[in-house]
Amino acid sequence: KITVLYGGQSSEREVSLESGKDIYHSLKALGYEVQLIDYPKNFFIEQFSQEDFIFIALHGADGESGELQKILQQKRVLFSGSDHKACMNTWNKNTCKNLLKKNNIPTPKWINVSSLIAMQRNLEDDFFDLLRPFKELFLKPAEDGSSIDVFKISNNKDLELAIESCINSSRAFIFEENVDFKELTVPILNGRCLPAVEIRTSESFYNFNAKYVNKDTQLLEFILPNDKKNELEEICLKTMDVMGCRGWLRVDLLQDKNNNFYVLEVNTVPGMTSHSLFPKSAESIGLSYNDLVNEIINTK
């Protein structure tokens, strides 16, 4: 029996609900015995055994921080995607970027701050001096997804507006260098890279509106010469190995004007709505949504 866990309590709940429903209907169409459980209110670990399989469709901390995976591993219940250690490596952007840097995988320069509002209060006018070498930055929560509370920062006024707009400015954030870029993502399925997808949007970057609101965002197959394609895939597979990921994941990157690649982050539970990046990439090589779901639950 397969259980799809969806929902959760994070800011990505609505996305998770859509992903979970699409996965559930796909599994039903494939002939599996399947149930949907809204996590955590209807989830009790005691109801599962080693004969069960959990498809984790939870985005944000509920499904990607590693806590749920740890519980399932202790109970020896099989589940989709990476184990708890890999999730812990990828969930915190500072931890992830430190691992990338340690293993010589290119990633934009960054500064980690434990509390955004406290940092602003302590630094006052000195703040921009600290970040001056970066020219322009992205402000991102150290732990969150779907581009929630992500802002482009060019000056102190931008920072003040970002702090005012944040859902929670007392948590940890990173300031990340803005690379002159193309934005792209590479899904990985069972140890092989699916076609890279380039993201084009009229927004200043691929923010929440670009992902879920605006209709003009384009997801295009990212065409590269063979040598650059091989380089990109090597970077992504090395990233997967360094983080300890397995099964399915998505590596988000930038390409600068000199055609260099930079890894931004790793998603251990990628979006699985019918219009998400992962299914779009799979579709471009003839892998239907149902085929993709079937392969995810059969990856090792």
Where are these regions (language model features)?
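Phosphate-binding site of ATP-dependent enzymes
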Residues: 151-234, 255-262
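Glycine-rich phosphate/pyrophosphate-binding beta-alpha loops
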Residues: 147, 202, 267-281
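Conserved metal-phosphate-binding beta-hairpin within the catalytic cores
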Residues: 177, 186-188, 241-272, 282
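ATP-binding N-terminal substructure of ATP-dependent carboxylate-amine bond-forming enzymes
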Residues: 1-91, 95, 114-126
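Active-site nucleotide/adenylate-binding loops and adjacent lid/helix of ATP-dependent enzymes
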Residues: 2-5, 34, 49, 89-176, ...
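Cysteine/selenocysteine-centered motifs that mediate thiol-based redox chemistry or coordinate metal-sulfur cofactors
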Residues: 292-300
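Short Gly/Pro-enriched turn/cap motifs at secondary-structure boundaries
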Residues: 58-61, 141-142, 177, 240-244
